From Swiss-Prot:
Coiled coil: none annotated. Homotetramer, a dimer of dimers. One homotetramer interacts with 1 SecA dimer. This is Protein-export protein SecB. It is found in: Cytoplasm. One of the proteins required for the normal export of preproteins out of the cell cytoplasm. It is a molecular chaperone that binds to a subset of precursor proteins, maintaining them in a translocation-competent state. It also specifically binds to its receptor SecA. It comes from Acinetobacter baylyi (strain ATCC 33305 / BD413 / ADP1). HAMAP family: SecB (MF_00821). Keywords: Chaperone, Cytoplasm, Protein transport, Translocation, Transport. Disulfide bonds: none annotated. Pfam families: SecB. GO terms for cellular component: cytoplasm. GO terms for biological process: protein folding; protein tetramerization; protein transport. Its main location: cytoplasm.
Amino acid sequence: MSEEQQTQPQLALERLYTKDISFEVPGPQVFTKQWQPELNINLSSSAEKIDPTHFEVSLKVVVQANNEGETAFIVDVTQSGIFLIDNIEEDRLPYILGAYCPNILFPFLREAVNDMVTKGSFPQLLLTPINFDAEFEANLERAQTAVEGQA
């Protein structure tokens, strides 16, 4: 490999996998009631350095559907990817791990959630697309405002 190729920025998804998945229907009585669910959706992301050039990025979602005051189902999915990240400016790393990689993972997470819910014999559940770039920028602004407020 030439020296120029060794210094070129590299960013690639090398492995995509479901790290954790569960689906629970606490009671069969939910199937006898009219379906008008209230959804509680919690989404989070995390990143872990595996070695100098590889990171595991994970998106986790927990969805709890309540119907007529009872839990209809709980679905918990963690979708992960191993990303090769090399020769990238250090100041770009938070954006890549906090927005770029989650944008890649989200469609797979969304599909896994929908599959679990429909296999549980509930109506389709398609999570609304998320703009992780905008979320990342908003988090930066909140952090900067908090720091300025302490000064």
